[in-house]
Amino acid sequence: MEPDSKKVKLDIFNFPTTRETRTPEEVAESYAEAVKSHPFYDNVHSVVDFYDSGTIKDGRGQIIGVVLREALPKYAASMASELLTSAAVRTSLRSMMFGGEPPLSGIAGYFDYRGSPVELKSRKTSFTYEHEAAWPAVFPVVDYVSEIYRHVAPERWKAQNDAIPDLVRIHGTPFSTLTINSRFRTASHTDVGDFDAGYSCIACLDGQFKGLALSFDDFGINVLLQPRDVMIFDSHHFHSNTEVELSFSGEDWKRLTCVFYYRAALGEPASYAEYQRRLEKSKTDTRFTPVVHHVRVKENGTSVNRPSPVYPISQSPFWVPMVAHCLQHCASAAQCVHEAMTADGSRLAEMMFGESLSTSDGIPLRGEDEKVKANGDSTPRPLSRLGGFSETNLMVSTAVEKKKYLDSEFLLHCISAQLLDMWKQARARWLELVGKEWAHMLALNPERKDFLWKNQSEMNSAFFDLCEVGKQVMLGLLGKEVALPKEEQAFWIMYAVHLSAACAEELHMPEVAMSLRKLNVKLKDFNFGGTRYFKDMPPEEKKRRMERKQRIEEARRHGMPSGSHEKRANWLTNDSFDYQTEDCVIDYAQHKWVLPALHAKEVTKTVRTGELPTTERVVRVLVVIPDPQSKLENVDCKLEVPDMVGSSSEWERLMSSPAVHRVLSAAQRNLQLPDSVTHGNVQTHFAFHSTLPTDIYDFVVLQHVLSRIPDDAQASAYIRRAAALCSGCLFVVETDVQCRQYYTLKYSIRCSYDTVAPLFFQQLHRVCYGTKTARVRTKGELESLIPTVCCARYKLQGSPLNTTVHVVSPFPSCEVQNLSSALCDRA
C-alpha cells in the first residue's frame, strides 16, 4: 500500500517544539570532556594579580609579556569596538576552550582556512569581506597597537614584519588576523598557528567587568586588562582567563577583546601558490582590476606550533617592583630583598609579613560540587543555523521513529525520480567508501570500536556530496526553496540517524562507530562550507543547482532587510584576487589624531626590558605591626562563637586546617617590638603602628595594621602617612575576608561563608595581634583605601589568615609617570 505523500511530508517535520537545547547530563558530559584538555584556571591558582604597566619575564629573562595601561586612544578603541562587536558570534569551533559550549568569538582580516571545510583558502575572512566599506574603522587601533609593539619589542616586530606576505597585511602592519572575543572566558590554551618568531598583541576594546584576568598558567601570574589596555605577549605560553567577579547572580557585564597576530600559514608555500593562482586567473577577468599586481615571496621561517619552554619564576611581593614600570626607581633595591627572601632557609617573609610565602596545609580548597561552572555565564541557546542538529534525547528518539522516511520506498512518492536516483547513488557511494575504510581499520586492529574520520579522504568528499543531495531532498519534501530553522533541525537529525543506522545494519559496524555526535560535527562542517564540493558534480547537475541556487538567493533577498546573506553566499565562492582592496589611507592630521609612532613613543617611554642593575648599598625596610592592645593567652576560638556558627559546615571547613590550629596555639606576635635584623645588605627595622618613626626607608611594610583601624577614612589616611616614609614602595599586608575562590562559588555557599568568615578571621587576629575586634575587609574594600597607585596584589599561598599583600606606589599616578620618565632619561 502506497504511503500518503502529504501525511508523510507532514510527519517528517513534525518534531518536538521544546527548546532545542541539550539535557543537563549532556551538557555536563561535554563540559567534563572539554576541561580534560583545556582546564580552567581560577584566581586561586595564581600568586600575583598584576594591575599596573610592567614587563614580565621568565626565570631566564625571556619576555612573557609587556602590559601597558590605557595605551589606546579612546577614539581608536571606540571605533574598532563599534565595528568588531558583531564579529563575535556563537561558534562551536572554539567550544573546547569554553567548557564544551560555543563562545562568542570570531576572526577578521585574513585567514588560511587550513583544515577547514571551506574550499577557497588563504583569503579575506567573511567578516572583512562583508564589511569592506566599514573595515577602515579598525585601522587606527591596528596602527597604534603595531607601533606600540615596535617600540616594546623591535626585534620581534621586525622579524614578523619581514615575514608576513604583503598581500595579507592589515593596513600595512605585521598583523594578518584579528580574533575578537566577547564575554568569553577562555580555558587554558596556546595560540597555535601564530608566527613563532614574533609576539601576539591583545587589547581590551570595551567592557564593564571585574576579574577575567589574562592568566599565564605556568607562572601563576594574572594580568588585569581593562578597556584601552594593551599587552604584547608570547602567546605560545599557556594562558587563560580567571573567573568574572560578579557580586550577585545575573549581574550585567560585558567585555570585548581583540588579539592581533600574524597567522604563519599565510606565508607558507601552499598560500603563496593560492595567491599566484588567483593572480593569474585575474589577468583573464576584464571586469576586475586588482589593487596588487604581483606576489612577492618572502622567507617565513619555521613555525613548529609548540608551547614555549617554561622557566619558572621565584616569586615574592618584592618581585613586583622588579616588574612594574612605575616602581623601576626601586627595582634594584627590591631585587636585593627578593633574593634574600626566596633564598633557601630564609625566614625573612615571616619577619616582614607575619607568615611564610607558602603554607602547604592551609585552608582547604573547595570541591567542584561547590562551584559554579567556569562557563556558567553561557546560558543555553538554540543551535545556530550553521550548526547540525540538537542532540537532546527527545529529538534523537523522535528521529529514530522517522528515519524510515529516508528509505527509497517512502521517498519514491515524495520527490522527483531524478532526485531520488541521485540520493540512492550518493548514499550507496558513501556507504561503499565507509565500508572500505572500516575494513582497513579492522585489519589493523580487530578490536576497534570507533571509526576514524579522515577529513582529506575520498569518503569525506562523498559525505559532503551526499549532504548536497540530502539538502535538495529536504527542499523537495518541503516543496519550497528555503527551510525554516526548525525544519532544518528536524531533517538533519533524521538524516544522521538514518545514516548511523545504515552503517550498523548494512555494514555491520558497532553502533558507536558512526555516532550521531560524529555525524553532527561533519554536518556543521557541511553547513559552513559545503559549496567546496560543487566543482565535483556532473555538469548537468551543476546547471540545475545553479538555477535552483539563483531562485533560492532571489527569494532570500526579497525577504531580508539587508544583503548580508547574499554577501555570505558570495564570500564562499569568491575566487577573485581581491587582496588589499579594503585598504585606504588614514589622514591622522585631518582628524586631529596623534600619529601612531608619536603616541607609541609616549606610552612606552617608561618601559624597561633590559636587565636590572645590581646595587651594593644597604636596603632599609620598616615593618609596622599593631600595638599590643592586650595579652591573650590560651584563647579557645570555640568559646568565642555562637553555637549556630560554630556548628556550621563552613566553620568546620575553616577550622579543619592544621595551619589554623598552629596559629591558635602560637604566642601573640606583637607583645614586644622585635630588634632590628640584618640579612646581607638588607636591614629590617620594626615599629608599632602608633609610633611611626620619621626616618625615610626604602620600603615600608604594614603588617595587619589596617585591621586595627575600623574607620575607612582613617585607614586611607594612615596609608598615605606610611607611604611618606618610603622612597621605594609600600606593602599593605591584610586579611582578605573573601576566600580565594569566592567568585567561583555557588551563591548559597557564598552566603554560608559570608556568615562565618568575619568572625573566624577576627578570632585569628585576636590570637595573633591581640586585636579585640579586627576590621577584616574584602579585596575591593582594601583597594578602595589606597590613595595612590596599587600595582599588584600578592597572595600568600595557603595562608590561614588568607593574607594578601598589596604593593602600593607612594606617589600619585602623575608623579609616578614624571619620576619614571626622569629615570628613563638618565638611563
UniProtKB/Swiss-Prot annotation:
Q: Where in the cell is it found?
A: Nucleus
Q: Which residues hold 2-oxoglutarate? A: 255
Q: Where is the stretch described as Thymine dioxygenase?
A: 62-264
- Annotated EC: 1.14.11.6
InterPro entries for the chain: 2OGFeDO_JBP1/TET_oxygenase_dom, DB_JBP1, DB_JBP1_sf
Chief localization: nucleus
Q: Which CDD domains match?
A: JBP
The cofactor remark states:
Binds 1 Fe(2+) ion per subunit.
Residue numbers spanned by region Disordered: 364-383, 539-568
Point out the annotated site residues (description: Involved in J base recognition and binding, conferring specificity towards J-DNA): 525
Keyword terms: Dioxygenase, DNA-binding, Iron, Metal-binding, Nucleus, Oxidoreductase
Q: Where is the composition biased (Basic and acidic residues)?
A: 539-557
A GO molecular function assigned to this protein is: thymine dioxygenase activity
Q: Please provide the Gene Ontology terms (biological process) for this protein.
A: base J metabolic process
Would you tell me the Gene Ontology cellular component terms? nucleus
**Primary role:** Dioxygenase that catalyzes the first step of DNA base J (beta-d-glucosyl-HOMedU) biosynthesis by converting thymine to 5-hydroxymethyluracil (HOMedU). DNA base J is a hypermodified thymidine residue found in the genome of kinetoplastid parasites, which is localized primarily to repetitive DNA, namely the telomeres, and is implicated in the regulation of antigenic variation. Also specifically binds to base J-containing DNA (J-DNA).
Q: How does it assemble?
A: Monomer. Binds to DNA as a monomer.
Q: What is known of its domains?
A: The DNA-binding JBP1 domain (DB-JBP1) is necessary and sufficient for binding to J-DNA.
Recorded protein name is: Thymine dioxygenase JBP1
